[in-house]
Amino acid sequence: NAKPEEVARIKSEALAMRGLALFDLTRLFGMPYTLDNGASLGVPIEIQTTLEDHAPERNTVAQCYEQVLKDLNDALGGLTKEKHDAYMNYWSVKALLSRVYLYMNDNENALKCAEEVINDNGGIYRLFTHDEYPSVWGKDFNSESLFEFYFTMSEPSGGSGGEGAPMVYADNVKDWNNLILTKAYLDLLNEDPEDVRHVFPHLPENAVADTLPVAAKGQPKYLIKYPGKSGSVTDAVSTVNPQDNDLCILRLSEVYLNAAEAAFKIGNTEKALTYLNAIVTRANPAKSVTSADLSLERILKERRKELVGEGHAFFDYMRNGKSV
């Protein structure tokens, strides 16, 4: 008895999720599209129900990206432009398309999709302000969240179970000291002592246990970007529980940085600076990037600072042919 528009929405959400899954599998198990225009092997494309003895073969990266684009574009027609927390909507798919096109070096389309999200969403999404920045990270469906996986402690698994992004929170008082911030990242952040993102790195609370790695002793090496629904990044690390922190997959700040990179690559310095400085100046209102300072390296640096702990840096450097 479902209404046709409801069936269309559910199908579109499934297509969007399939596109997201295939994209993530391809970038993880395949070479970057930009290496050889997708000629190398990616992952099998499986879009039909098969018998258990089916032996899938790998498709090329280009074929995988073609299917990703088809799924995402086919999804758009059945999705709402209204905010739909914990579900894919029109804007989250457009944001994902900006990411996919950027990975393909299709910068015209990457910029087009990113700008549509930024300029046409009707105010249902907006960047955090400088003052809001320290207090938003545990909240459900904040103003930048285009799509996130929802977790609650009432689930049998106990929220996220501490897996995924919340595990980036890793204080050695709980014996999770295998995930720490690198010196390279801390050096980037320390270039500006007034950067609001200094709220994320924390010193170990247990001085006795602060022994490994030796080179990082006494450094603020733990990332508390996921403090849980009742926590704050300014709380003591040992007092917060990240297990019920939602996992944000698509965030508006990334879309701005996608737009900045795409605009730079097609030679539109004005737009590149506009979108980049929205992030730079938010982090420190006294700072901005000038045309003389604008470069791909500067944009990637800002991506690394802003999107730390969100799973982007490795792929950003790989797709741009940079050393990791």
Regions picked out by a protein language model, each given a short descriptive name:
Residues 1-165, 176, 187-324:
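Acidic/polar-rich alpha-helix caps and helix-coil junctions
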